């Protein structure tokens, strides 16, 4: 995180859970040393700098060098993303599974080299008085990025299906916890979202891409549903479509996990 007022860059690190302050000459010093294994994310609002950690999913408010206080200890085992604006903090607190372990021929246990398993995502809001409220939950995947728009709407990126959700934290923005898909891309992970410019932008991983969001509607769109396991012999029903424009349906069935 770049602090223009202090002309310093703050860097969150692991595995020792330290936040470093780096001046324009490249000199660094430890600004905060957490008891947690990793500091995963930083966010600022005015003079306050916030840090999210793994292990116990704690959010700290950093008021100065080695001056920190706990904002909240969230359920889960990591705070992956933070966003702060006008006294409100948005927190992505995930419950991530432990890495799979495999045993080699020499009986040494090591982490398996495969795509990480998705966790369970929880989106929280902390108000200016420190009250925490859960706004949204996602049991089929975890959250990886956050941003707060001018009207207080929270944009939350997913780490499994390449979607960004719009979640309204206030009654005039759709009601607490009301979520709708805002963006859906082919890439699997949404890693960062920026709403500070003329047009929102976001970056993805697996694979890497940079997107700019425009107001124009796309010429065409594709939506793929999740696989439905009927668990016994089943028969197709009927598909109905209500709306304008040309639409095409394609279906697939079979006896495998992914037909």
Specify the residue positions occupied by each region the protein language model found.
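Blade-level signature of beta-propeller repeat domains, shared across WD40, Kelch, NHL, RCC1
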Residues: 191-219
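Non-cytosolic beta-sandwich-type ligand-binding/adhesion modules
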Residues: 216-259
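Conserved beta-propeller blade signature
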Residues: 8-11, 48-51, 89-91, 153-156, ...
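Residue-level signature of beta-propeller blades and closely related beta-rich strand-turn architectures
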Residues: 15, 55, 95-96, 160, ...
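A short loop-to-beta-strand structural motif that recurs across blades of beta-propeller domains
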Residues: 17-20, 58-61, 114-124, 163-165, ...
């Amino acid at each position: 995180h770049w602090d223009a007022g202090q002309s310093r860059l703050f860097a969150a690190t692991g595995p020792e859970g330290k936040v470093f302050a780096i001046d324009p000459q490249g000199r660094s010093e430890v600004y905060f040393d957490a008891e947690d294994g990793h500091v995963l994310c930083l966010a600022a609002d005015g003079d306050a700098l916030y840090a999210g950690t793994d292990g116990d999913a704690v959010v700290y408010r950093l008021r100065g060098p080695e001056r920190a206080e706990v904002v909240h200890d969230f359920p889960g085992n990591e705070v992956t993303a933070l966003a702060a604006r006008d006294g409100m903090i948005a927190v992505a607190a995930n419950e991530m599974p432990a890495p799979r372990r495999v045993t080699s021929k020499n009986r040494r246990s090591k982490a398996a080299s495969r795509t990480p398993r998705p966790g369970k995502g929880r989106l929280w809001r902390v108000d200016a008085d420190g009250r925490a409220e859960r706004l949204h939950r996602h049991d089929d995947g975890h959250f990886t990025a956050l941003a707060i728009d001018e009207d207080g709407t929270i944009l939350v990126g997913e780490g499994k299906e390449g979607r960004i959700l719009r979640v309204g934290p206030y009654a005039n923005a759709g009601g607490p916890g009301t979520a709708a898909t805002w963006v859906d891309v082919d890439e699997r992970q949404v890693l960062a979202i920026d709403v500070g410019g003329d047009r929102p932008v976001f970056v993805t991983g697996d694979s890497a891409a940079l997107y700019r969001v425009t107001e124009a509607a796309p010429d065409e769109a594709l939506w793929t549903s999740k696989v439905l396991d009927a668990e016994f012999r089943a028969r197709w029903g009927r598909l109905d479509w209500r709306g304008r424009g040309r639409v095409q349906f394609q279906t697939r069935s079979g006896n495998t996990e992914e037909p």
